[in-house]
Structures are given as structure tokens and as C-alpha cells.
Amino acid sequence: MWIPDSKGVYPDLLATSGDYLRVWRAGEPDTRLECVLNNNKNSDFCAPLTSFDWNEVDPNLVGTSSIDTTCTIWGLETGQPHARVYVAGHVKTQLIAHDKEVYDIAFSRAGGGRDMFASVGADGSVRMFDLRHLEHSTIIYEDPAHTALLRLAWNKQDPNYLATVAMDSCEVIILDVRVPCTPVARLSNHRACVNGIAWAPHSSCHICTAGDDHQALIWDIQQMPRAIEDPILAYTAAEGEVNQIQWGATQPDWIAICYNKACEILRV
């Protein structure tokens, strides 16, 4: 994930996750590793990271989720000692977010966009946290069968709404944080499990979903809470399951999907 630096005040930083969170600096003549963020330096073993998110309002904040039930919020610092930009990081907070593995984390634009984030995990719940009040969290949704929730995505224009998907589920669940535990919509047209969710960057009522049925579907959800029967646009990848999807942040006419060994750019 590239640093969300719309004003161009930071170096060209790229973060990757796996065993640890790594921050790289892209530039000429090469790309180099700036720092490895490890919160457990006393052990030779690590709990793998499952996901991370870069705060769009404050790019100094990065949140990670892990199979060890925790979420960690990292603070990044950049400086220029001896005419060379350096990047370092420290743990701002680490919390036990779920009863089981945490599979995804995402910052919300609510409340100024800096302090609110949500996570999903193997316990089947969506939980929302506020960095200013970490002594408690809010359970937004719990899967009735306690099926693991794999992904979540916040609405880019209306932070009251988020979407999530359960493991091996053909259905995307739309939630309203003002009405906890009750889905306001279910998007059910996929014929195989859903792998990716992406809200439109320019519209509060459009969302794209992608799955193992080779399909990428765009939905209009403005009629909620009435049932949403069908997507407004559909694309079928001929050669494989769609594994991930991204909606262009600065050029919302474009959506990227990946399947097999291919990446395709679709015009909406």
C-alpha cells in the first residue's frame, strides 16, 4: 500500500505486510527498505500480520491486524539527518481486539478521520475502536453462526456505513454503525465466495464486489433499507476467480481486478 499523501509532503513510501510491517522508499536509482516494524524483539518467532491500513488523514499512523488477536497502531516519523530522509516507527498502542485471530483492519473517516477504526476476525464480529477511548470498543455486528469475517471496508463518503464478508460466503453485508448488529442490506448475487470489496471513492451509494464466480459487480445501495436485488453493472473475468479489486481513488472511472496471473483495468 502506498502512503496516502495527497499533498506530496512525504517521501514516496510503500508499506508491505507478512511476518512484519515493512516500509520502503521508492526512488531513483533504486527502492530501499527504510524500516521493519516489530513489536516483539525478544522472540525469534512472530505472529503473522493479516492486514494493515494507512490512515488517510494522518499518514503518520498505520494500523495492523494479526493472528495473535491484536491490533497495533504504529506511529511513523520521517526526518532528514545528514541530508538523507529516514523513516522510523514506534508502537502508539497495541490492544487485544478480538477473542480469536484478527483478519482485517480499516480506519474510518468518522470524527475527523484520525482516531476511529474497525476490525473483523475469526470470532465473527465487527468491532469499532476509538484511539482516544481504548478502554472499550463497540460491537457493530456478530455473525449469527459465528463464522469468521475476513474483510471489511468503510464507505468513502459516508462513514456511517461499512461492508464486510464472511469466510466462504457469497453474500456481502452492509452495516450502519448507528444501528448495531442489524445489517441494512445484503448483496447476494454472487454464485461463489466473495473475495474483495471496494466502495466508490466519489459516491456514497456505490460499491463493487468480486468473487470466485469470476464476477465483479457494482451495486447501487441508495434504496436501503429496501432489499437490493441486482447489481447495476457486471463484468465476468473469463479465465479465473477474481481475487482482489481496487477502485481508482483519483480517477473513479477505473476499477482494477486481478485473477490468475492477470490484472485488468476496467472502465466504469
Report each predicted region and the residues it spans.
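WD40-repeat beta-propellers
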Residues: 21-27, 71-76, 105, 126-131, ...
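WD40/WD-repeat beta-propeller blade-loop signature
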Residues: 45-48, 58, 91, 101, ...
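Loop/turn segments within WD40 beta-propeller blades
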Residues: 2-10, 52-59, 106-114, 153-159, ...
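Eukaryotic helix-linker segments that join adjacent hydrophobic helices
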Residues: 1-52, 58-62
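WD40/WD-repeat beta-propeller blade N-cap
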Residues: 37-49, 87-89, 95-102, 141-149, ...
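Conserved strand-to-loop turn within each blade of WD40 beta-propeller repeats
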Residues: 16-19, 64-68, 75-76, 120-123, ...
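Blade-level signature of beta-propeller repeat domains, shared across WD40, Kelch, NHL, RCC1
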Residues: 243-268
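Loop/turn-rich, solvent-exposed surfaces of beta-rich toroidal or solenoidal domains
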Residues: 165-168, 188-226
